[in-house]
Amino acid sequence: MRKFATYQAYPMRIIVLATLLLTGCQGAYFKTMEKLGYHKRELLVASVKDARESQEEAKEQFQSALEKFRAVLNFKGGDLQEKYDKLKAELDSGESRAAAVRERIEDVEDVAEALFDEWQSELDQYSDENLRRASKKKLDETRTRYKQLIKAMKRAEKKIDPVLSVFRDQVLFLKHNLNAQAIASLQDELVSIETDVDSLIREMEASIREADAFIKEMG
């Protein structure tokens, strides 16, 4: 089990949580967090917030990478190596942002699964049928809303790798062809890359809106 970004908010508990991580025991993690006053519902909201933030950062990163690529293609003189280095740095950052997005989505799935399993099992503990029905209705609504959220997040995530692949190709080509002729040969790629990045941004923004709505409903 990975370290949820939520840990960063609780520095006093790092040693305890690190121990749990070493055991790889998800159940022990949740039990310990509940003893510390953090229940699965709160952990799910925190994980969704972390995932939302990672997608916002990834969106900004790819916008920045596109700008750096345009700067290389619009090269009119000066230090071409410097522009290449900046583009390569943007690609490296994009790779890191992409990994963070994937990890945060997995964190959301881990907590959601634990929450819904617990919630479902607790329905049998009710003696009051009206309360049981009300709880089940809320569970079904939350699960439906969650499915919409995770679908949007994964749809956005799937757009990342194709964009990274294109940027990776351009950077690799430029690495050994830092000259005006090589740059000119990449001009035809710009429209395609812009289209891919724009599509990614739209999916990211849709996912972020879903996260905002989910957080609001869970609050």
Show where each model-derived region lies.
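C-terminal motif of bacterial Sec signal peptides marking the signal peptidase cleavage site
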Residues: 22-24
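Amphipathic alpha-helical membrane/lipid-surface binding segments
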Residues: 33-36, 69, 73-76, 80, ...
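Immediate post-signal-peptide N-terminus of mature secreted/exported proteins
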Residues: 28-94
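Long, heptad-repeat alpha-helical coiled-coil segments that mediate oligomerization
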Residues: 40, 47, 54, 61, ...
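Compositionally biased, intrinsically disordered terminal targeting/sorting segments
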Residues: 28-33, 64, 68-71, 103, ...
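Bacterial N-terminal signal peptides that target proteins for export
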Residues: 2-15
